[in-house]
Curated annotation (Swiss-Prot):
Positions of the propeptide segment: 30-79
Classification via InterPro entries: Cyclotide, Cyclotide_sf
Name this protein carries in UniProt: Violacin-A
Role according to the record: Probably participates in a plant defense mechanism. Has low hemolytic activity.
Protein's GO biological process: defense response; killing of cells of another organism
Organism listed in the record: Viola odorata (Sweet violet)
S-S bridge residues: 84-98, 88-100, 93-105
Keyword field: Cytolysis, Disulfide bond, Hemolysis, Knottin, Plant defense, Signal
UniProt free text on domains: The presence of a 'disulfide through disulfide knot' structurally defines this protein as a knottin.
General remark: The presence of a premature stop codon inhibits the translation of a key Asn residue that is thought to be required for cyclization.
Modifications after synthesis and translation: Violacin-A is not a cyclic peptide.
Regions annotated as coiled coil: none
Signal peptide bounds: 1-29
Family: Belongs to the cyclotide family. Moebius subfamily.
Length: 106
């Protein structure tokens, strides 16, 4: 195999490896979200300052919010009501008076 073809093969392998490596985190990511109502409660209570970096996705569309809450209710917790409107990805709830019942705060 000449040098030009060898460089092309190595380049293709590097591109494929990089593309695969970039897809793994996206495929294994867990959505960590908070509803607009829960976020507003955090701001009003002053507890927002206790969160070092807001890494949650704020859901402000009522239809999308209801869909996410329904998904988590049906998939993980049966027919439980979700009162806090926040997921607890790292087993911590920021909304006051809520505790983690993975994957959502109650």
């Amino acid at each position: 195999m000449d040098a030009q073809k060898m460089k092309m093969v190595i380049g293709l392998v590097l591109v494929a490896t990089t593309a695969f490596a970039l897809m793994i985190p996206a495929a294994s990511a867990v959505d960590d979200f908070i509803t607009r109502r829960a976020y507003d409660n955090l701001v009003k209570s002053g507890a927002i300052k206790d969160i070092p970096v807001m890494a949650k996705t704020i859901i402000s569309n009522p239809v999308l919010e209801e869909g996410m809450l329904t998904y988590y209710t049906n998939k993980k917790l049966g027919d439980s009501a979700i009162s806090c409107g926040e997921t607890c990805f790292k087993f911590k709830c920021y909304t006051p008076r809520c505790s983690c019942s993975y994957p959502v705060c109650k």
